[in-house]
Structure formats: structure tokens, C-alpha cells
């Protein structure tokens, strides 16, 4: 069987393949468009045997300092069947090397750590990497379950807070206008300052809202026209994925963050998604809040890299230190700009 890698330049065709392969929303065209506006270049490719499409991947390419040239990264991809994984990855690695001169092909698949995909990834010459972008330890809910089944896995206090919020006069609905989006950004800044995490510039979030459209719903808790809390997601046909969330001081007092999370679950189920991914668990207060919504955790495969250059060992040692330095510089700049 002769395989080839073919670029895809049509948005509708591409997003159709994402849904066909039950792909992740970070593989959607609109997500790539946003990353392409903020430091990456984007290449969407299909792996074909001339008769059938065996797999596909949205490649994000980042230029690196000399002599490394480039990193090719696939967020929550590629997309293919378990039986085709090794062949698809081999084709993608060859393409990443010849077309983009990558020092490595880095993938963070939307596959369970103990799924049949795992040995196929290793067989394709990939190795685990500590250069993680998307956290593999997460919480994924099955939205095929009923309200009662979902709530049964929550803590008693969480159920009580949800029911109280849903009985209140707060209106839980999707954010629709640019003015409402600006309220979202205001609360996100407030939440980031309170919790001490870094965020992008506002234009990044406005671009997500514009480029993904219905593929990036924001569920808000409104008191009249005033936003109190939000959950911002991206979604494909199969999966809803939390991107961001925030709550105002007043929203905290009313505990509407419980209600808005529940409203987001129901909205994504109504939109036809079968999975709801809380997007990572750490050992922090935000993760403690997430863990109140289920009794289990999920572990995805994590980050795997295929070396494409003799310089890969140097890159693999240098990259973690470089990322830490960049993150420290961003935190410093943020503190300076607040003064």
C-alpha cells in the first residue's frame, strides 16, 4: 500500500474530516487560524492511500533559533484509527522533516494512556517528552449520561450549589455579542489576578471568538445584563473542551460558578457532544474545583516526540529551560505593566 500526505485547503472539507474521525476541537480549522495569527504557521494535511483517507493532522509550526530551525506540533492529534496509527505517524514525521525541516514532531493525542493507540505510537519511533503543553491528567465526562447520573458522581455540596444557582434569578445562556465578550475578558483578567496565573493579550481571545464562531461557545451567568461568571469552550462534533473560565467577586458570593459549569455541561450535551473535557488537572485550587464534578480522573497519553534531526538531544535538553525563562519573563512583564 502506497501512502501520501496531501494538504487540505478547504475549511468545510477539513472540519468534516475532524468530525468523521471524532476529532478534538483543537484540530478544527478555526483553532489553527487563531494560532496562525499568533506566532505559528499552520499546515493541515490528509494521509491517503489514493483511495481512502487514513488520517489527518493540523500541524502547527514554530520557528526556532538557529540551528534547530522548527518545531512541528500537533495539539490533540493526529486523527486516525488505532490500526492505522503507526503508518499515519510515519507519513506525518517524514512530511514534517522534508516540508518543514522540523527538529522534532511533537504530538499530544486525544487518546487514553492505556488505549490500543499507545503501543502504535511507540512503534512509530516516538518517545515520551517532558515538553508538555496540554496536561494529560484530566477529567472527561460522558455526556450520554442523564442529569441524575452526572450529579450522582458529584459531591453533595456541589449538587446543592448547582441547584441553588439554578433556582436563582441568574440567567445562564451563551454569550452572543462583542459587548458581552468584553465583559468576559474583564472577568478573566480579574480571575487571573486573583488566582495568580498568566493570560494572553485580549486580541488572542477576540480572535478565538471570531475564528471559531459556533465552535467556541461561551456559557455565561447573567444578572440582567451584568455577567457574573463564564465557561469558555471549544467544541467539535464529538468533544467539548474547556478553554477558560472566570467568576467575578459578586459571582463568587452567589456561587454561580457552580451553576455556570452545570449549564455548560447541559449546553454541550444539547449541542450533540458526547464528551466534556475539563482540560487538565493540576494540584491547585482551580483543579480542586473541577474535581468536585466527578469521582474519577482520566489520563491521556501525554506528549510524545519523534526526533527528526541529529540536534534533537540538544533541543530536548534546552527546551525546558528556555520555556521556564520565557514564562518568567512574561510574568515579570505582566507585573511591570500593572504598575
Regions found by a protein language model. Give the residues of each.
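Short, high-confidence coil segments that cap the C-terminus of an alpha-helix
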Residues: 40-42, 100-102, 270-273
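Active-site/acyl-donor-binding loops of N-acyltransferases
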Residues: 2, 7-11, 34, 60-61, ...
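Aromatic (often tryptophan-rich) hydrophobic motifs at membrane interfaces
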Residues: 87-97, 204-316
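Short histidine-centered catalytic/ligand-binding loop motif
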Residues: 72-83, 193, 247-254
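Short catalytic-loop micro-motif centered on adjacent basic/acidic residues
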Residues: 104-107, 173, 274-278
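A conserved beta-strand-loop-helix scaffold within acyl/acetyltransferase catalytic domains
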Residues: 3-50, 56-67, 109-114, 119-136, ...
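Glycine-/proline-rich flexible loop or hinge segments
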Residues: 67-80, 100-106
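Conserved beta-strand-loop-alpha-helix junction that forms the acyl-donor binding cleft
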Residues: 107-116, 278-285
Amino acid at each position: 500500500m502506497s501512502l501520501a500526505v496531501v494538504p487540505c485547503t478547504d475549511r468545510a472539507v477539513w472540519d468534516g474530516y475532524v468530525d468523521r474521525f471524532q476529532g478534538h476541537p483543537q484540530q478544527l480549522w478555526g483553532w489553527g487560524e487563531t494560532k496562525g495569527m499568533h506566532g505559528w504557521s499552520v499546515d493541515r494535511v490528509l494521509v491517503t492511500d489514493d483511495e481512502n483517507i487514513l488520517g489527518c493532522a493540523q500541524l502547527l509550526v514554530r520557528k526556532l533559533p538557529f540551528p534547530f530551525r522548527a518545531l512541528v506540533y500537533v495539539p490533540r492529534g493526529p486523527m486516525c484509527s488505532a490500526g492505522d496509527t503507526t503508518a499515519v505517524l510515519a507519513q506525518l514525521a517524514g512530511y514534517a522533516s522534508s516540508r518543514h525541516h522540523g527538529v522534532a514532531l511533537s504530538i499530544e493525542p486525544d487518546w487514553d494512556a492505556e488505549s490500543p493507540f499507545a503501543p502504535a505510537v511507540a512503534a512509530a519511533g516516538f518517545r515520551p517528552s517532558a515538553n508538555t503543553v496540554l496536561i494529560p491528567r484530566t477529567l472527561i465526562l460522558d455526556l450520554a449520561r442523564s442529569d441524575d447520573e452526572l450529579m450522582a458522581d458529584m459531591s453533595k455540596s456541589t449538587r446543592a450549589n448547582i441547584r441553588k444557582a439554578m433556582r436563582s434569578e441568574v440567567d445562564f445562556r451563551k454569550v452572543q455579542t462583542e459587548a458581552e465578550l468584553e465583559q468576559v475578558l474583564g472577568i478573566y483578567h480579574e480571575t487571573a489576578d486573583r488566582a495568580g496565573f498568566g493570560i494572553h493579550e485580549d486580541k488572542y481571545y477576540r480572535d478565538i471568538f471570531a475564528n471559531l464562531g459556533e465552535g467556541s461557545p461561551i456559557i455565561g451567568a447573567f444578572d440582567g445584563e451584568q455577567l457574573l461568571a463564564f465557561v469558555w469552550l471549544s467544541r467539535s462534533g464529538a468533544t467539548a473542551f474547556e478553554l477558560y473560565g472566570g467568576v467575578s467577586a459578586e459571582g463568587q458570593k452567589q456561587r454561580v460558578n457552580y451553576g455556570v459549569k452545570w449549564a455548560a455541561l447541559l449546553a454541550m450535551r444539547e449541542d450533540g457532544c458526547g464528551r466534556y473535557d475539563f482540560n487538565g488537572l493540576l494540584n491547585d485550587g482551580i483543579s480542586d474545583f473541577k474535581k468536585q464534578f466527578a469521582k474519577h480522573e482520566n489520563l491521556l497519553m501525554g506528549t510524545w516526540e519523534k526526533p527528526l534531526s541529529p540536534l534533537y538531544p540538544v533541543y530536548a535538553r534546552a527546551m525546558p529551560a528556555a520555556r521556564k525563562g520565557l514564562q518568567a519573563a512574561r510574568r515579570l512583564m505582566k507585573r511591570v505593566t500593572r504598575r
